[in-house]
């Protein structure tokens, strides 16, 4: 979804994306002012979106973690949408090569990211089961 001023103001308080929001908003305002659009209709110009901001937050969150090897690929990318939603794929390499530690680190990273979804007005898709339907 396109982000409004109130939502951007709230998200700008998140340290890991505050500079990105400021810089990108400045670029968007400049871009949109150079084209003849009705600015109150978001689809007429460039705008920040909740999933785009979550992708950037995810990447910056990984880069800020000392357990991630920043000298190797660190990336969060959007895959082709499906009937189950818009999948995101994360590439990152952990500095600790011990398997148990690796699994704990990855679990902690995903715990945080999954808990952060609602901040960006996003939800995790789960297939319904018999428990959900009853």
Regions found by a protein language model. Give the residues of each.
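Structured, soluble regulatory/oligomerization domains located on the cytosolic or IMS-facing side
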Residues: 1-134
